[in-house]
Amino acid sequence: MEKAWRIYIRKGWNITLLKYIGNIKGVKVQIAQESMNSHVLITGMSGSGKSVRMTDIEVESIKEGKTVLVLDKDGTHYKLSKSYQNVISVLEDGLDFRLLEPIQAAESMEEKKVQVMYVADILAAGQNLGDRQICCLRTAVEYAAEHKDKDATEMYTISRCLEEQKGNSAEGVRSRLWGILNGNLLRPSAKQIEPGKINIISLAGINPKTQIQLIEIILSVVWRQLRYRQFSKVDVVCIDEIQSLSLKKNSALFELLTESRKYGISLVLATQSLSVFNKKEIAALGQTAVKLYFHPSEQDIRSIAQQIDPVAYERVAMVLKNLRKGQALTVGDIEKAGHKIGGPIVTMSQFWKEEHSKFEISNNTGGR
């Protein structure tokens, strides 16, 4: 068994990007081969079919030989046969990152400093820490790398060093990261990412603030390891309820959206409404190759229609209003049977028809 699921080298860097996004009358609709990226944005009201389509995309991805990582905040992902999915409960199983190992393996002081900054940046992801707080965190990380055997986990050692530093800055960091440092969540685990499966990282039972921190940390690990060409076990990352995550420039999610094609990773992002995002965030999300608009709320119909077609928005609004459960108005770089599709089309989820038979699914999501 692998020691940790984060450090693997992809031999030859055989990039396999996401393809399938839905179907029309049994014919698969895919992201166009010449698209600048293979990211997908899914929006729509609760119960409109977003989660089924996301699962549909996940299943098709593993059928193509890809490995999928799903960040499931509330443990409400559709349950599939064990032959398709691998569930890692962070609360029960732990999440095996072993962030300090690269620091310990550093062959020079310069490399060690780089690795310390790398780990501190991961832990600080999305926290808006000040310069003094970052300095305190780096000191704690460096100390922990040298003394981690004194505690049960790496995070406990970092927490202890922050406490021993005293002062408002160190205490502020420790307070801000309390759930991560003292929750026994990032720890050695027997559960690992399994190639060719839908790997569901369940954050169920963890308080909402710590859930968001964990997602930011996971995305930061994925992004930074991609940049160093060390993270190769995941091809597709799926995240629901993205409105809680940072989309600021230099955030992990922003970097993955804008730079990850050359590293061979695809994002599938979902949210109920785009109205909660500011203009800069919408611009970042606008870089996704394909948008799947499921039935929106009444107040969102007009704005979405105008984004899709500023001239003929009334016609688009009527299509959005009449979407049935499982249907999505699909916009972007798409093709069907190898032919590029020019305008918006309505697609359906293949998984919708098969969910009670072929994939042994049981819906525990309350109709998402």
Predicted regions and their residues:
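P-loop NTPase motor domains
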Residues: 3-9, 56-265, 269, 278-281, ...
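Short, solvent-exposed loop/turn segments at the edges of secondary structure
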Residues: 35-37, 196, 286-287, 323-325
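C-terminal regions of RecA-like/P-loop NTPase motor modules
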Residues: 3, 277, 282-285, 293-368
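Basic- and hydrophobic-enriched, low-structure N-terminal and domain-boundary segments
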Residues: 1-45, 53-57, 97, 338-340, ...
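Conserved lysine of the Walker
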Residues: 50
